[in-house]
Amino acid sequence: MESIDWVVVEPGSTYIGSSNRAVMFGAPGPRHEVSIQYRYEISDSAIKLSEVVTSVESGEVDISSESEWQLAFDRGLISEGLGIEVLQDRLASSYWGKICDGRPFHQRNSSLMVCREWRGREAIPRYLPANSETEHMVRVVRRETREPNPMAPRLPIRPPRTAVMREEALIILILGIIPSFLWALFNASPGYIETVSYTHLRAHETKAN
């Protein structure tokens, strides 16, 4: 690995995920803090996976996790890359159940590769199909320790039921009731609004029960 330039990342915390509803905004949540308690090195630039796959398979290096990548980016240690970089994490739909100590998160039945897409000096989260044929550009890491933290915090396996019900009610309101009323306001005959209101409210009450 003599050809790789490394930068050192000291322990610290970063934030991952979106606080927006994934189904409405296309960004997995919840937003959460990750505390990395170990020192590690990350490659100064992205590398073709095909060039380091042997070293990854031998355990000499590892592909960077999303948290490790983000902490290095937050500190200005990596910048102005090109295109899309693939990280080690894999998601199905959310971060629920993730252990928040910096290790990669592999969700059961995962179908999405967690990535970062460079846009000038900014890097935004991207989620590509796991079977994507995009050439994989990765950053590799060398960790001070390979032992997971047994006391690391973990997100709940699933979101609180009250939060889910509140989000579903908001989706029904935004995508169902409000558009119906707006359409009725300009197009419907008298009495249509009362019918739509009753129908939507009954449907929501039935689902809640």
Give the ranges of each region predicted by the language model:
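Short, flexible loop/turn elements at secondary-structure junctions
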Residues: 13, 40, 46, 67-68, ...
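Surface-exposed recognition segments
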Residues: 32, 84-188
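Conserved hydrophobic ligand-interaction patch in extracellular adhesion modules
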Residues: 42-79, 83-86
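A short glycine-rich, aromatic-capped structural motif
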Residues: 2-57
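Conserved small/polar residues in nucleotide/adenosyl-binding loops
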Residues: 199-206
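Activation segment
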Residues: 18, 51, 73, 94-95
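Membrane-interfacial hairpin junctions
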Residues: 186-198
